[in-house]
């Protein structure tokens, strides 16, 4: 029983992390664009 509980918690954590990584992927190009546009000015 304990093993399955740990597995469920691990699954939840990895899913949340994957969503964060996906969100980060969308934000990263914007962040770099913003950073470089500020440097060129």
Swiss-Prot record:
Keywords: Competence, Pheromone, Secreted
Record carries keyword Ribosomal protein: no
Main location per the UniProt record: secreted
GO cellular component: a single term: extracellular region
GO BP terms in the entry: establishment of competence for transformation
Pfam families documented for this protein: ComC
Superkingdom, taxonomy of origin: Bacteria
Residue positions assigned to the propeptide: 1-24
Alphabetical list of InterPro entries matching this protein: Bacteriocin_signal_seq, Competence_ComC
Subcellular localization: Secreted
Coiled coil: none
Molecular functions (GO terms): pheromone activity
Function recorded in the entry: Acts as a pheromone, induces cells to develop competence for genetic transformation.
Family as reported in the entry's similarity comment: Belongs to the ComC family.
Name the UniProt record assigns to this protein: Competence-stimulating peptide
Top-level taxonomy: Bacteria, Bacillati, Bacillota, Bacilli, Lactobacillales
Gene: comC
């Amino acid at each position: 029983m304990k093993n399955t509980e740990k597995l469920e918690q691990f699954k939840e954590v990895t899913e949340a992390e994957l969503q964060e990584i996906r969100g980060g992927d969308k934000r990263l190009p914007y962040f770099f664009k913003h950073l470089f546009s500020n440097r060129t000015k």
